[in-house]
Swiss-Prot record:
It holds the Pfam family GlutR_dimer. During catalysis, the active site Cys acts as a nucleophile attacking the alpha-carbonyl group of tRNA-bound glutamate with the formation of a thioester intermediate between enzyme and glutamate, and the concomitant release of tRNA(Glu). The thioester intermediate is finally reduced by direct hydride transfer from NADPH, to form the product GSA. One of its GO terms (molecular function) is glutamyl-tRNA reductase activity. The keyword Calcium does not apply. It comes from Koribacter versatilis (strain Ellin345). This is Glutamyl-tRNA reductase 1. Pathway: Porphyrin-containing compound metabolism; protoporphyrin-IX biosynthesis; 5-aminolevulinate from L-glutamyl-tRNA(Glu): step 1/2. GO terms for biological process: protoporphyrinogen IX biosynthetic process from glutamate. Disulfide bonds: none annotated. NADP(+) binds at G190, A191, G192, K193, M194, S195. It is an enzyme of class 1 (oxidoreductase). Homodimer. The record marks H100 as: Important for activity. Belongs to the glutamyl-tRNA reductase family.
Length: 431
């Protein structure tokens, strides 16, 4: 079988947060997935991209069907994938997979079109795969090109300027419940980049009392210095939650950090005044049951998606221009990728022709006697020139075919006519 680019995954378009959080992967779990799956049948190169809005396996594979099955078997064994989950997953191949990867890196496939966070997440996923030794020359080329496309999209369109970010939607939802945010007390649970962005947005809209809660107090202190707030360890959070008007939670805890009983205690301490809780973590930090507590207004990633879809006209104009750039870049890269795919066959053909020429030269020497040095050099140069003419002509023909199906047919014909072994693993390529 010929090597293929494959993406297997799910995202916010195909699944609610309750499903996505089951397949979310921490950095450690991503390393484990990389090391396990790269040894699986059919998978030659692998990148795992896991964010709050998507979990995707980007594969360069010598057997697309077997590779996709290997991913599903892994998810079944490690994450309890059930038959009822299958409808949330997609499998994309070749041109469709390439377009998808470019759209993801350019934030055209994001919940918030134009949001900048995906670029860093994309780079981190690639760096992690490189560190794990699971990428080679093909996926490295794909990932590098995707980031180049992303940069061009941001430089040549207004896609970033038009983004309605998750921190922005946090402010909008808070204002809907609480009105103006002047003097509102804010608790940020988690000290990541998303929490920092949310803090800046909230402060720009009047919030002045910021409390940063984190499992690692040192990180909370570093964060609080940036925003002029106070730092609190996670285990000491209770009294600070009791006085919060807005709670934004984005930790990486594997369990709920605010449960229904916590919300009931908070509301008792607040006298039932309205409180906004924004859960931007996947897996979720806040038990959905807190919605049953009077006065609690809980918003999770599904709610933020609904807000992000409003007033999309400006972003859609920028997205149209971005899609044109993407199509142009994908076309050029696709040609390059198709040319790369036939290299192993051309190399095998050259080796085969060289072997035939050596055999024929040896037969000629035995028949005519030893050549002089000049004759030997001339005959060797002649056979090398013949090899170059034949292999070069076929290489140009194979590389310039517009459709993969035609390329596959001619490649197989060359392999059969010249008795070449199908170089499956060589075609996948590794560093």
């Amino acid at each position: 079988m010929e090597p293929s680019l494959v993406v297997v995954g799910l995202n916010f378009k195909t699944s609610p947060v309750a499903v996505r959080e089951r397949f979310w992967m921490s950095e450690l779990r991503r390393y484990e997935a990389l090391h396990q799956l790269v040894r699986a049948e059919g998978i030659d190169e692998l990148v795992v991209l896991a964010t709050c809005n998507r979990t995707e396996f980007i594969l360069w594979t010598s057997d697309a069907g077997e590779a996709a099955d290997s991913v599903l078997r892994f998810l079944t064994h490690e994450y309890g994938l059930k038959m009822s989950d299958w409808s949330h997953f997609y499998r994309l191949m070749d041109d469709v997979a390439l377009n998808h990867i470019f759209r993801v890196a350019s934030s055209l496939d994001s919940m918030v079109i134009g949001e900048p966070e995906i670029v860093g997440q994309f780079k981190n996923a690639w760096s992690q795969a490189q560190a794990a030794g699971t990428t080679g020359r093909f996926l490295d080329a794909v990932m590098q090109k995707a980031l180049t496309v992303s940069k061009r999209v941001r430089n040549e369109t207004a896609i970033g300027n038009a983004a309605v970010s998750i921190p922005y939607t946090t402010v909008e939802l808070s204002k809907q419940v609480l009105g103006e945010l002047f003097d509102k007390a804010v608790v940020l649970m988690g000290a990541g980049k998303m929490s920092e962005s949310a803090a800046k947005y909230l402060m720009n809209h009047g919030a002045s009392q910021i409390c940063v809660i984190n499992r690692t107090l040192h990180k909370a202190q570093e964060f609080s210095e940036k925003v002029g707030g106070i730092a609190v360890a996670l285990e000491d959070r209770a009294p600070y939650l009791d006085h919060a008007d807005i709670i934004v939670s984005s930790t990486s805890c594997p369990h709920y950090v605010i449960e229904k009983a916590d919300a009931e205690r908070i509301q008792a301490a607040r006298g039932g005044k309205p409180i906004v809780m924004v859960d931007i973590a996947v897996p979720r930090d806040i038990d959905p049951a807190v919605r049953e507590v009077p006065g609690v207004h809980l918003f999770d990633m599904d709610d933020l998606e609904k807000v992000a879809k409003r007033n999309e006209s400006e972003r859609q104009v920028a997205a149209v221009a971005a899609e044109e750039i993407l199509a142009d870049e994908a076309k050029g890269f696709r040609r390059k990728l198709m040319a790369e795919r036939v290299v192993p066959t051309i190399v095998a053909l050259r080796n085969r022709l060289d072997e035939v020429c050596r055999q024929e030269l040896e037969s000629l020497r035995q028949e005519l006697g030893p050549f002089t040095e000049d004759q030997d050099q001339a005959m060797t140069a002649l056979t090398a020139h013949i090899t170059q003419r034949i292999a070069g002509s076929l290489a140009r023909e194979l590389k310039e075919l517009p459709e993969r199906s035609e390329q596959d047919m001619l490649t197989m014909a060359v392999q059969r006519l010249f008795h070449l072994e199908q170089p499956q693993k060589a075609a996948a390529g590794t560093n």
